[in-house]
Amino acid sequence: MHLLTATVTPFFPNGTIDFASLERLLSFQDAVGNGVVLLGSTGEGLSLTKKEKQALICFACDLQLKVPLFVGTSGTLLEEVLDWIHFCNDLPISGFLMTTPIYTKPKLCGQILWFEAVLNAAKHPAILYNIPSRAATPLYLDTVKALAHHPQFLGIKDSGGSVEEFQSYKSIAPHIQLYCGDDVFWSEMAACGAHGLISVLSNAWPEEAREYVLNPQEQDYRSLWMETCRWVYTTTNPIGIKAILAYKKAITHAQLRLPLSIEDFDLENVSPAVESMLAWPKLRTSVFSYS
């Protein structure tokens, strides 16, 4: 079982990137052995300028992490997405997370042609991202079937919220690595053969998340994990997890970029979420503590 952390992008109150907090987050994930995904929806990738994204990725690569590092490629303008892929091709990353184009709602042929274009441009393997709640369309099963043997098609991150659809992806492309993209569904998707979890909660609890990923049917882990999810996921991601990280002093500020706002999260949820994870069974080895 593998764990990748969908990493937040820390900001100062003036909106600039807090690179010191980012380094702290990445170093902790590296110490535990969790891979990282940068500039996805949790990383507010669509809210960063091209120069900011370039600076962030180069900064992360300069840290020489020992764990896999994946980079998000969200966008709707193909020329810009291809330009971003070409920039990242020359960097020592592990691969891309390629999101179904948002807002435009492509049908089957358009989606296949889009992913063909971005996969053909990539020199690193890619995980395609099924996220219909944000993209307004799913990663179609026939798209997966058409691209199943593309040499750069490594896997799928499934945040569709359906175990049945997850199983359909697996039956169509059994050789593709399937990642659960929702913290709340890890136990069910692990039982269906998931390769791993791409987690948001692991930003704040990297060791606990790793234990749960390795032991998805352990009832004590599952109960505490689900209780924490109940408090964190009361609003749009990454608002809740940034509030948690700031509370735990993992990042300096819970700053987000508009249209996201910390005002859309009840800060009274922070303490119960943190307290619920304090009941986690004592880890065999502890690498660090945020607070």
UniProtKB/Swiss-Prot annotation:
Disulfide bonds: none annotated. Transmembrane segments: none annotated. InterPro entries: Aldolase_TIM (IPR013785), DapA (IPR005263), DapA-like (IPR002220), Schiff_base-form_aldolases_AS (IPR020625), Schiff_base-form_aldolases_CS (IPR020624). GO terms for molecular function: 4-hydroxy-tetrahydrodipicolinate synthase activity. It catalyses: L-aspartate 4-semialdehyde + pyruvate = (2S,4S)-4-hydroxy-2,3,4,5-tetrahydrodipicolinate + H2O + H(+). Keywords: Amino-acid biosynthesis, Cytoplasm, Diaminopimelate biosynthesis, Lyase, Lysine biosynthesis, Schiff base. Its EC number is 4.3.3.7. It is found in: Cytoplasm. GO terms for biological process: diaminopimelate biosynthetic process; lysine biosynthetic process via diaminopimelate. The active site is at Y129 (proton donor/acceptor), K157 (schiff-base intermediate with substrate). GO terms for cellular component: cytosol. It comes from the Bacteria. The record marks S41, Y103 as: Part of a proton relay during catalysis. Pyruvate binds at T42, I198. Pathway: Amino-acid biosynthesis; L-lysine biosynthesis via DAP pathway; (S)-tetrahydrodipicolinate from L-aspartate: step 3/4. SMART domains: DHDPS. Homotetramer; dimer of dimers. HAMAP family: DapA. Belongs to the DapA family. Catalyzes the condensation of (S)-aspartate-beta-semialdehyde [(S)-ASA] and pyruvate to 4-hydroxy-tetrahydrodipicolinate (HTPA). This is 4-hydroxy-tetrahydrodipicolinate synthase. It comes from Chlamydia pneumoniae.
